[in-house]
Design a protein with these regions (language model features):
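Bacterial N-terminal signal peptides that target proteins for export
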Residues: 2-16
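Accessory carbohydrate-recognition regions in carbohydrate-active enzymes
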Residues: 29-390, 394-438, 444-497, 510-531, ...
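Terminal leader/tail segments of proteins
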Residues: 699-705, 745-749
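Surface-exposed interfaces of beta-sheet-rich extracellular modules
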Residues: 710-725
């Protein structure tokens, strides 16, 4: 028998491949692992780093925007719409309901705060610096320096779960209902037992509108360990005058120990106190409801029950990973993957779930409680999201988008109008235009039609034609008569443009219904922006009620949210190309391709382009309408992605606007963009990954997936585009062709 001789070369080769496989296996990351919730927590991105489930009602955010130590980014020192700012250093609790990427302060209430030592109820005194923050999908942790307490947080859809690790000695958990981001006041609290608190916090007046529409958010908090002592506090208003002389307690905080009575007021809260002989952990589960305390308790019991913090975290992490895995990317850097999947994560926060686990939810104006077998969604920032978020949902998450349309139609049943900027069954009517019509049309034209389309069409026509007491379209009578709004109205040019886009979408729906008269009527209405086009300036400008040009006119006025006569949140340059349904017509108005391209280029050269402002975010793609200049779109999109979107807290260009900036990034990195909302088309640019696989929902699409592939990685211009091996003759592709294809290949020089 010959002795065994080891082949050293083969052994080394085998070891190399084994170690390579082992390394890949060990370090392989799921899409959810790339999420960095700190992105957008600075530079007014208005994101928060704490945990939330996909489309979750409950969320937890560190609250660090109260107190002079956080100036200038303090909630009462400027217009601040987020509960957390990355640069701030003073923490006063962890809010249990929050909004992500909105432009006005709201929610950010029901603040939980762990402390040690004697009970202190003044947040400016019990607040603390913090360190060692960790944030990832479904999880956030932080060390609270003053008390040497570690806080960990996760969430299910309707329940927030906190885990505090306390040192030996007296420890406290405070529940503060007075402090919050909202400008609304009023709360109720009751200690049910040594392990449970229930209550309500009033919120509302979003963007300082309709304070009479304030509404309650209910909660039930359950603690894993019974408190040794508990109590409730109340800070009353201070009286003046004769009565004040007799009130020895005037304006003084009251602490009611071991009481189980219900306490109401503006600045109230509760505390649980523990005496620990060694390091201990306490878990707090807080169920949320917009219907009742009983529903909050049921949400907690049925959604979480007795399961542990770690079990809930794992479940919510898996939910995130399932949603994010609908798009798989290959060939990018770690930072590319991080900004991409974090952006996709941000698009899956709002709209979010409003109904409780039993299906109940409050209707608009809260006249009654209704029930759904689907999901009742809320937080529709439609002026922002109609441009790209909802088209993205239709492509990747069509069932969610369908339920969003159903939610919008039930809002029409409840309120008589389609939503404009709806928040927790309160219609705020914030911003301008009639964006719901665009979203419904866009969804329908992409083949998602499992809702009452007849009701949808009727609702769209009501909003477009009712000239009396129409909250969706102020100034509609002038618009129909003259074709535009005059300077008697706020933002007349931009509002005219928004009405035009909505009217175009209605003409598309009318065509689907065979309603020829309305096809013609609304198509004509959609082109009326042309009456505001000044050929001497190649710009849109406002007209006065007598039809004359408004003077003095400064096309630069309006940038950076400066008030101006013609436009809402923008200026003439930023709005000049916002006619996505009539770019061909705009080119003719400007004098042809070269004049159009030159005017478009001027926006970028003179730094009028605002990446953080919705009206102009499609501008980089408009070069695709000029034959031979498509390369400018490719260069500009890549430049903007690299300049404004980064793996850092300042990694968004500004307010995320409930996912709109993030959706722009998702599309741009994939190499397609929904250039004309309502029209089911995409324009194409260079993908930033070698390969993108979009998994399609078989309930709505025939194919399992569509692949976008970049053939050459040298950053050159696109030489040709192929769909299933056949060359496309343009930089545009219909939604149907795209989802019924197999591979879209972008070939670069």
């Amino acid at each position: 028998m010959k002795p065994m001789v080891l082949n050293t070369n083969k052994f080394q080769t085998a070891c190399f491949f084994y170690m390579l496989f082992f390394s890949i296996t060990i370090f392989a990351q799921e899409p959810a692992d790339f999420v960095n919730p700190f992105i957008g927590t600075s530079n007014y991105g208005a994101a928060f780093p704490g945990p939330i489930a996909p489309r979750g009602m409950a969320s937890i955010s560190p609250f660090n925007v109260a107190g002079v130590k956080n100036t200038p980014m303090e909630k009462d020192s400027q217009w601040l719409s987020n509960p957390y700012v990355n640069e701030n250093t003073f923490l006063t609790g962890f809010s249990q309901v929050n909004l992500s990427g909105v432009g006005c302060p709201e929610l950010g209430v029901i603040l939980l705060m762990p402390t040690t030592g004697n009970v202190e109820i003044d947040h400016l005194k019990y607040g603390s610096t913090y360190s060692n923050e960790v944030a990832k999908a479904a999880y956030y942790s932080v060390n609270i320096d003053k008390y040497k307490v570690k806080g960990e947080f996760t969430a299910s859809k309707r329940v927030g779960i906190s885990r505090f690790t306390f040192p030996k000695g007296q420890s406290n958990i405070l529940l503060n209902l007075g402090l919050g981001l909202t400008n609304e006041e009023g709360a109720m609290i009751k200690v049910v037992s040594s392990t449970e608190i229930e209550g309500m916090r009033s919120v509302g007046s979003f963007c300082y509108n309709s304070p009479e529409d304030a509404y309650p958010v209910y909660f039930v908090a359950q603690f894993s360990k019974p408190a040794d002592k508990f109590g409730v506090w109340k800070k009353p208003a201070k009286y003046n005058g004769v009565e004040a002389q007799w009130m020895g307690y005037n304006g003084k905080a009251r602490i009611m120990e071991n009481t189980i009575k219900t306490v109401v007021g503006d600045s109230i809260g509760s505390y649980f106190t523990y005496k620990f002989d060694k390091q201990e952990t306490v878990e707090v589960k807080i169920g949320i409801s917009y219907v009742s305390i009983d529903n909050a308790r049921e949400n907690l019991a049925k959604e979480v029950g007795n399961r542990s913090f770690d079990a809930i975290y794992k479940e919510t992490y898996n939910e995130w990973n399932e949603e994010l895995s609908k798009i798989l990317v290959e060939g990018g850097t770690k930072d590319d993957n991080t900004i991409f999947y974090t952006a996709l994560y941000h698009t899956l926060i709002h709209p979010n779930t409003l109904n409780d686990i039993n299906g109940q939810y409050p209707v608009i104006k809260r006249t009654k409680i209704a029930k759904t077998d689907d999901t009742r969604y809320t937080v529709f920032s439609l002026w922002d999201t109609y441009r790209n978020v909802h088209p993205l949902m239709s492509l990747v998450y069509p069932k969610q988008q369908s339920d969003m349309i159903k939610s919008m139609l039930t809002m029409f049943d409840e309120n008589g109008w389609l939503p404009k900027w709806e928040l927790n069954s309160t219609e705020t009517f914030t911003m301008v235009g009639d964006p719901a019509s665009i979203v419904i049309t866009d969804t329908y034209m992409r083949g998602i039609r499992d809702y009452d389309v007849n009701k949808a069409y009727y609702a769209m026509l009501k909003g477009a034609d009712n000239v009396e007491n129409n909250p969706l379209r102020p100034g509609l009578k002038d618009y129909i008569k003259k074709g535009y709004l005059t300077t008697d109205n706020k933002g007349p040019v931009s509002t005219t443009q928004e009405y035009n886009i909505s009217d175009y979408s209605i003409s598309l729906m009318a065509n689907e219904f065979g309603d020829k008269d309305n096809v013609k009527r609304f198509k004509e209405r959609s082109l009326s922006y042309r009456k505001l086009f000044d050929k001497n300036l190649n710009l849109l400008r406002p007209r006065t009620p007598d039809g004359k040009w408004y003077e003095p006119f400064d096309p630069n006025s309006g940038a950076n949210f400066e008030e101006n006569v013609g436009f809402i949140e923008g200026n003439a340059w930023q709005y000049n190309f916002m006619v996505p349904h009539d770019i061909i017509g705009l080119k003719k108005l400007m004098g042809g391709d070269q004049a159009f391209s030159a005017q478009l280029q001027k926006i970028f050269d003179t730094k009028q382009f605002d990446m953080a402002n919705e009206p102009d975010i499609a501008n980089p793609y408009l070069f695709n309408y000029v034959k031979g200049e498509e390369y400018k779109a490719q260069e500009m999109v890549k430049k903007l992605v690299r300049e404004y979107f980064k793996n850092e807290p300042k990694g968004l260009p500004g307010n995320d606007d409930t996912g709109t900036m993030s959706a722009w990034l998702v599309y741009s990195m994939m190499g397609i963009y929904p250039i004309s909302p309502g029209d089911p088309i995409y324009t194409i640019t260079a993908p930033m990954f070698h390969r993108v696989t979009i998994k399609l929902d078989p309930r709505y699409y025939k194919k399992d997936s569509i692949v976008i592939e970049r053939q050459i990685n040298n950053g050159g211009k696109i030489n040709s585009i192929e769909l299933n091996g056949k060359t496309l003759n343009s930089f545009f592709i219909s939604h149907d062709d795209f989802v019924n294809g197999t591979k879209l290949k972008v070939i670069q020089n």
